[in-house]
């Protein structure tokens, strides 16, 4: 939890609101469960090579425990190489903030893979979502809200940027009617150079169209140069991009170089039999269709669409997905080391072990 700006009002109805993190009663007095402030450069530390497994809980409606909850975390924080595996709610949820992330993998989670709320405005690259392919267990790839509560006019709007995502849905046996995205409530984000495939529902459902239009008077909402494949119909034909066809307000969603084409990934098996390979063919659409350029020091310039190149799988060697044998060769079994004492000095941990925090 951090101290960057939310688009929720404080008790006086003014900016720089604070919130209690989900999973605790709103009457909880401790600052340890409170997030929000006025420092977008807030530093909440470093998370790198972290695997979060078999967690989460749905306590009540709109009161859940996500795999990773980021409340008002600022851009001074480092978050990269994160896996959330088989969580019973969202994989990750951003509640406002400005934190930048890279190499995020949301695997087999039972609600959304990536959830955005309360005016999140970070930069992101190399996001991977893989959803369950059995029954009614996984929702949208991304549920992206600009804000919450009754007042949808509060700023800042959610002007998040995502480059190089790969979202693989549940396929023809996945959850009924759940598509790639659910956008609503002043969302004004962007996706570029990404691959979205294997979802039963629409590519995009749009709610609260009046608030979406208000947040996007400058055309900030943009889905540019992405690949869409096997969305809804599963017969090789292009599916409708939006559920309610707001073409006038949202031309940037359906235009700007979006392509309906097979990215020819190496494999999408969810059986743990070595048949999963999210890398695209170098001779396919991921390498041979127009791309958005990147600028600034955060983004890594690459010549492909999606979260993976044709050669490298950045989940190999450390992720639970790899350890369970989903890729072509299972990773070496690591030793579990239980950590029960407080860590008060600089400590070096080995990649040969799994460290279990007690």
Task: Indicate where each model-derived feature is located.
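Extracellular beta-rich repeat passengers
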Residues: 1-89, 93-344, 350-358
